[in-house]
Regions:
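Surface-exposed peri-terminal alpha-helical interaction modules
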Residues: 1-145
Length: 145
């Protein structure tokens, strides 16, 4: 379950990185280049990754038996709102007949997308800590010596 969450976060982060590059290229339409064809693919992967992400995180927290479950659940409610808001913006862009670099630049600048990315960075870091706790103990012990 933690690997799935990590993969979903990575899909959204990769989409954002691709969109940064796409926005800088000055395309008038997604039909102008190979990158243009890819932008819709990245956006569709992000939609798939975001759909149900908060529920998946809540289920993982329950399965992992994490302490302070109420803190996690409160944050997952925030994640759900940010994901839904970002999904609405992404789906609006996907509904357009042409996706220009300017349109993607505006999507990148969306406060909803930025809030979501910050949420995902936080989730990714927490998932990473729970996925590799033994490695951290070993590293911590070797640093103390």
């Amino acid at each position: 379950m933690l690997a799935e969450i990590s993969n979903r976060c990575n899909a959204v982060e990769e989409c954002y990185e691709f969109m940064l590059a796409y926005a800088a290229q000055g395309f008038r339409s997604d039909r102008d280049s190979k990158s243009g064809g890819e932008v819709r693919d990245f956006l569709h992967r992000a939609v798939t990754a975001l759909t149900g992400l908060a529920e998946t995180c809540a289920l993982a927290a329950k399965q992992e038996g994490l302490e302070s479950a109420e803190k996690y659940l409160a944050f997952f409610a925030v994640l759900d709102r940010d994901a839904r808001d970002s999904l609405a913006a992404i789906e609006l862009v996907l509904a357009q007949p042409a996706i220009s670099s300017q349109l993607i630049d505006n999507l990148n600048a969306s406060i909803h997308v930025r809030a979501l990315l910050t949420d995902l960075f936080l989730v990714s870091e927490i998932v990473s800590k729970h996925s590799h706790p033994a490695a951290e103990v070993v590293a911590s012990n070797s640093n103390e010596e």
